[in-house]
């Protein structure tokens, strides 16, 4: 018997059901890689950022996340090179779906009890997403924004429901707008920390702060 289609588990109707000591025997998620491309690139290498956001409250299967990841990665490697972008999958499949297997052979009514004791066994993993949740993020150079948008447009076809693609006003994966980031970097208030940056806060005695307030 093949895998039950993910359309059977599309809508969020119940509570989160993660893997635990009470929920055992859960199959591994199909998606195992959540960071792709030039993930060691410094924060100043890729100033632009593009997001794929969900516009629907639903479940996304781990198979769909993996298919979309492969699709976006393949297009970006072909058009920008394997070191020309950094793609990050922002949603993880933690919710376990169950299946109550039914026999369809002759004499099945003698072997099974129908809907008596119908609590199923773990079947797969899905990610619970809401409206406005970010599914994928990609940081790139300014000249490659159009390629990132096209990669996400192709990846959208792997998902049910509606998604929107937005170009972020932030600098890369940081939390600051580009103008604020460039100003603080020029002032020497930002210290590079891999993919992100750390804000150098004002430390020292109170008398110094009173003389030169922030």
Swiss-Prot record:
InterPro entries linked: Ribosomal_uL16 (IPR047873), Ribosomal_uL16_CS_euk_arc (IPR018255), Ribosomal_uL16_dom (IPR016180), Ribosomal_uL16_euk_arch (IPR001197), Ribosomal_uL16_sf (IPR036920)
Pfam families according to UniProt: Ribosomal_L16 (PF00252)
Keywords: Ribonucleoprotein, Ribosomal protein
The UniProt record lists the keyword Ubl conjugation: no
GO terms under biological process: translation
Gene Ontology molecular functions: structural constituent of ribosome
Keyword Amino-acid biosynthesis applies: no
GO CC annotations on file: cytosolic large ribosomal subunit
Protein family: Belongs to the universal ribosomal protein uL16 family.
Oligomer status and interactors: Component of the large ribosomal subunit. Mature ribosomes consist of a small (40S) and a large (60S) subunit. The 40S subunit contains about 33 different proteins and 1 molecule of RNA (18S). The 60S subunit contains about 49 different proteins and 3 molecules of RNA (28S, 5.8S and 5S).
PANTHER family: 60S RIBOSOMAL PROTEIN L10
Name of this chain's protein: Large ribosomal subunit protein uL16
Organism: Caenorhabditis elegans
Phylogenetic classification of the source organism: Eukaryota, Metazoa, Ecdysozoa, Nematoda, Chromadorea
